[in-house]
Amino acid sequence: MATPSLRSHEIPAHSQEAGNKSISSGSRRGLLWHLRARQSRVGLFEVGPGHELHRMTRMMQEGLWAATQVSKNNPPTGPTTQKDYLEVMTQVHEEGFELGTLAGPAFARLRKSIGLTEEDYQATLGPGDPYLQFFSTSKSKASFFLTHDQRFFVKTQRRHEVHVLLAHLPRYVEHLQQYPHSLLARLLGVYSLRVAQGKKKYFIIMQCIFYPTSRISERYDIKGCNISRWVDPAPEGSPLVLVLKDLNFQEKTMRLGAQRSWFLRQMELDTAFLREVNVLDYSLLVAIQFLHEDEKGIHHSVFSTFKSIQGVSKSKGTGDQNCRMLPDLPNALHILDGPDQRYFLGLVDMTTVYGFRKRLEHVWKMVRYPGQSVSTVSPAHYARRLCRWAEVHTE
């Protein structure tokens, strides 16, 4: 897929004011960090001094603070233009690294449209508390981090995956404008990091589907197939956070009640978009939280689309946009309450294109696993299958 050429400019970075710790990976190694890493933040490990990725994450934090300062000082005005999607801003830091912000104005507008201020974004991702490392059951070699409050998800990406994201970004933004309650995870920024003259590393920031995390009892990554879709559950009493897969969910059902029809319709709309951009291998993330007795049957205060989502076209009715009444909760776009349980739901990973390599993989898997459900199929088949899974596993 051809990707438009990016327009790059380089500026010196303005460091955060004195009081923040400088980037260092060697100081205070040892017992202190190991004690903090094993504290009660179940299955997540603080990337503190002594951690092999501490220096990299500190550079991310410093770089993101400086990058967001630019968008705070120069907020984009007017409608989004093609230039906004092509812009690359590179900031050179005195500490010996460069951070690139890709399509910065487009993402600044997207953050504003979901009510996320630049001040909040900067404070959460910038220097201060260390990131938390999350060990994924994914086959990907990517590194996964959460901000300390677990609101935002940081994931390293390969260069070609970033090119796919940027190529689809205008249509992604258009889809979110048309369907503001979409289940698609909100992508908040795409960045590059290079130390000295080394190779660039790319990473993305997105809202965490599984937030707020308190009382979440189960987490799943669903693709709608069976091959290699089982994870051995953690032993009872283990603090390890595991994201389970399709076969672990096989005998379960999500009891969505009155929200089921909305959910199934939005799954159709979102997977249709992913099919149109020729993407597969995405996942439906599912987390479950049991409601307390005093929460069951209570209708939380709700607010309408036009009050909660900025930039929504008011010429369209809520029926056209498949809108629902949102709960008055953090991360409301990804939360649906059933009669007994609260569900955290979102579609993630839109970087795998159905090209020649995936077509070959499809043929090979069909030969190796005849008659079985494999992950690598055409985008149309993939979308239908995941929607079918949602229909079968909800009531």
Swiss-Prot record:
Keywords carried by this UniProt record: ATP-binding, Cytoplasm, Kinase, Lipid metabolism, Membrane, Nucleotide-binding, Transferase
Disulfide pattern: none
Span list, region Disordered: 1-25
Tissue: Highly expressed in brain and testis, relatively to heart, spleen, lung, liver, skeletal muscle and kidney.
Pfam entry (one): PIP5K
Single Gene Ontology BP annotation: positive regulation of apoptotic process
Gene Ontology molecular function terms on file: 1-phosphatidylinositol-4-phosphate 5-kinase activity; ATP binding
Compartment list: Cytoplasm; Membrane
UniProt effect for mutating residue 155 to R: No effect on lipid kinase activity when the protein is purified from mammalian cell extracts. No effect on lipid kinase activity when the protein is purified from mammalian cell extracts
Span of domain PIPK: 37-394
Ranges in a coiled coil: none
GO cellular component, one term: membrane
Predominant localisation class: cytoplasm
PANTHER family linked: PHOSPHATIDYLINOSITOL 4-PHOSPHATE 5-KINASE-LIKE PROTEIN 1 (PTHR23086:SF46), PHOSPHATIDYLINOSITOL-4-PHOSPHATE 5-KINASE (PTHR23086)
Assembly information from the UniProt record: Interacts with type I phosphatidylinositol 4-phosphate 5-kinases, including PIP5K1A and PIP5K1B.
Stated role: May act as a scaffold to localize and regulate type I phosphatidylinositol 4-phosphate 5-kinases to specific compartments within the cell, where they generate PI(4,5)P2 for actin nucleation, signaling and scaffold protein recruitment and conversion to PI(3,4,5)P3.
Protein name: Phosphatidylinositol 4-phosphate 5-kinase-like protein 1
Organism (species): Mus musculus
